[in-house]
């Protein structure tokens, strides 16, 4: 298995499902073992919230904004994510900002919209590969008909949903997150004896990392419907795969089914 990232599905630019492949070793140098055919699903959101400063605005400070990476249901992502680096516009002092603990967020003031590149690092027993995301900071409100008046009370919210899938995870990672309310695990073998929950790198030093009581949480978008859409899509794909597998088995047992043409269109 190559170290790579695969886009499994993409409803639009703001909704993606990604599979991150790790190094194909069932056991690493630390003795950690992978669980074959198991997948861990972690829904994350990257976004920004910007408030217009109104009368307090100056030429180069018109908005106060916060950019962040959070759990889709505001649960703690510190069990999965170790560090997030936000790459701001080069006009900012120290444009490369490192956040080493949840909540993974930073706030600034400015006047212009720009693309923020985001690098997500996972704990060593989660994945060896970093995840590169990008987010366009939005300051000016608009709707389907175009720009609308600015308000100091209602912020501009821009968020995107990413469901990250980790195949063949380490046992220690699964043990740490198998009771996590926002993380799903598929195909856990019956009778699997998990080791004690792994202490992920510096996770034990981190403070409470959920964003349920974050000051900006009232403005966070809800993604429960998106999660259901991905679940339905995954279920449909599994059914289709099972049907295709059954058809192949029938062909092997009984030969080509009557009325079914060969895929090439030619007689064999």
Swiss-Prot record:
Domain of life, per the record? Eukaryota
As for subcellular location, the record says: Cytoplasm; Nucleus
Q: Biological process (GO) annotations?
A: cell differentiation; flower development; regulation of DNA-templated transcription; regulation of flower development; regulation of photoperiodism, flowering; regulation of timing of transition from vegetative to reproductive phase
Coiled coil start-end: 227-252
- YEATS domain segment(s): 34-180
- Upon deletion of the gene, what happens? No visible phenotype, due to the redundancy with TAF14B. Decreased FLC expression leading to earlier transition from vegetative to reproductive phase. Taf14 and taf14b double mutants show a pleiotropic phenotype that includes small size and abnormal leaf morphology. Taf14 and taf14b double mutants flower significantly earlier than single mutants under both long days and short days conditions.
Distribution of this protein across tissues and organs? Expressed in roots, leaves, inflorescence and flowering tissues.
Annotated Gene Ontology cellular components are: cytoplasm; NuA4 histone acetyltransferase complex; nucleus
UniProtKB keywords = Activator, Coiled coil, Cytoplasm, Developmental protein, Differentiation, Flowering, Nucleus, Transcription, Transcription regulation
| Major localization class | cytoplasm
Which Pfam families does the entry link to? YEATS (PF03366)
Q: Which family does it belong to?
A: Belongs to the YAF9 family.
Quote the function comment for this protein. Negative regulator of flowering controlling the H4K5 acetylation levels in the FLC and FT chromatin. Positively regulates FLC expression. Component of the transcription factor IID (TFIID) complex that is essential for mediating regulation of RNA polymerase transcription. Component of the SWR1 complex which mediates the ATP-dependent exchange of histone H2A for the H2A variant HZT1 leading to transcriptional regulation of selected genes by chromatin remodeling.
Which PANTHER family does this UniProt record tie to the protein? PROTEIN AF-9 HOMOLOG
User: Tell me, how does this one assemble?
Assistant: Component of the TFIID complex. TFIID is composed of TATA binding protein (TBP) and a number of TBP-associated factors (TAFs) whose MWs range from 14-217 kDa. Component of the SWR1 chromatin-remodeling complex. Interacts with TAF4B, TAF5, TAF8, TAF12, TAF12B, TAF13 and TAF15B. Interacts with the transcription activator complex FRI-C. Interacts with SWC6, FRI and (via C-terminus) with FLX, SUF4, FRIL1 and FES1. Interacts with EAF1A and EAF1B (via HSA domain).
Q: What is this protein called?
A: Transcription initiation factor TFIID subunit 14
Species name = Arabidopsis thaliana (Mouse-ear cress)
Gene name of the encoded protein: TAF14
């Amino acid at each position: 298995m190559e170290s790579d990232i695969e886009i499994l599905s993409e409803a639009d630019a703001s909704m993606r499902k990604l599979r991150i492949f790790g190094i194909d070793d069932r056991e690493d140098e630390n003795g950690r073992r992978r669980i074959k055919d198991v997948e861990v699903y972690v829904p994350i959101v990257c976004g920004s919230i910007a408030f217009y400063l109104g009368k307090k605005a100056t030429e180069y400070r018109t908005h106060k904004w916060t950019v962040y990476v959070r759990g889709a249901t505001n649960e703690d992502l510190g069990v999965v994510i170790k560090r997030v680096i936000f790459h701001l516009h080069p006009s900012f002092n120290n444009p490369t900002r490192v956040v080493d603990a949840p909540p993974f967020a930073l706030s600034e003031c400015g006047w212009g919209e720009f693309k923020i590149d985001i690098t997500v690092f996972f704990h060593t027993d989660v994945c060896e590969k970093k995840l590169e995301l990008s987010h366009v900071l939005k300051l000016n409100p608009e709707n389907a008909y175009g720009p609308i008046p600015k308000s100091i009370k209602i912020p501009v919210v821009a968020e995107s949903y990413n469901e990250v899938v980790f195949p063949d995870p380490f046992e220690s990672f699964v043990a740490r997150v198998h009771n996590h309310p926002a993380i799903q695990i598929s195909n856990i073998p019956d009778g699997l004896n998990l080791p004690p929950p792994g202490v992920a790198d510096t996770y034990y030093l981190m403070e409470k990392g959920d964003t349920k009581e974050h000051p900006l949480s009232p403005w966070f978008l809800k993604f429960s419907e998106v999660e259901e859409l991905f679940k339905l899509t995954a279920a449909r794909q599994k059914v289709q795969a099972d049907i295709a597998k059954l058809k192949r088995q029938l062909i092997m047992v009984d030969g080509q089914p009557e009325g079914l043409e060969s895929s090439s269109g030619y007689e064999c």
